[in-house]
């Protein structure tokens, strides 16, 4: 039996939710969903000038792997001048962003980045490109970050481009807990596309 397969390419965008401007109170989001099929990223906040470390941001939305369909609110402390800070949660959808402690000192931009988190799915295949430096692709479950479920190394000394199809049903990204998720981490990888289903 063949299930639907979708492709996903990890990315980042530092002003996906909010372009560079001074923010007060609840802001109007430019977009809300950074990826398809329930995947997501940590939300990033960067200020271009001034110290915002005394400012808190309340970020609400749906996190990756939450099958209960309830929103989560995370309070994120702002950073110093030109510093990017990230949420702890991986958000599949952001529904609200508010400045909790007054107006930010400098202009801020709100986006996403870092590792990508995948909901319960199966990795069927992938292709990647890498530079001459040694690199790796590592997939771990959120409840066990020390034991990867998939680890691919890219050798040093050559420009690498590779495609691999995983046999049978592929690699399941989560364990017995349906609310688990998997984290895909890249080191010295130029681009990666995962085929899941």
Describe the role of every protein-language-model region.
Residues 1-197:
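Surface-exposed, low-hydrophobicity beta-strand/loop segments enriched in small/polar/acidic residues
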């Amino acid at each position: 039996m063949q299930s639907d397969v979708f492709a996903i390419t990890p990315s980042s965008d530092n002003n996906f939710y909010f372009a560079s401007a001074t923010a007060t109170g609840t802001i109007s989001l430019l977009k809300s969903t950074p990826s398809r099929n329930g995947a997501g990223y940590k939300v990033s906040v960067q200020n271009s000038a001034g110290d915002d470390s005394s400012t808190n941001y309340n970020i609400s939305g749906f996190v990756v792997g939450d099958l209960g369909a309830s929103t989560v609110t995370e309070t994120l402390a702002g950073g110093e001048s030109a510093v990017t800070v990230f949420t702890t949660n991986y958000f599949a959808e952001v529904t609200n962003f508010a400045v909790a402690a007054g107006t930010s000192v400098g202009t801020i931009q709100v986006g996403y980045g870092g590792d990508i988190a995948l909901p319960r799915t199966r990795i069927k295949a992938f292709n990647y490109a890498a530079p001459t430096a040694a690199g790796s692709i590592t997939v771990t479950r959120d409840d066990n970050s020390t034991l990867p479920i998939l680890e691919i190394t890219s050798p040093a000394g050559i420009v690498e481009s590779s495609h691999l199809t995983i046999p049978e049903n592929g690699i399941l990204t989560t364990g017995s807990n349906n609310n688990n998720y998997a984290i895909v981490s890249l080191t010295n990888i130029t681009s990666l596309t995962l085929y899941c289903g």
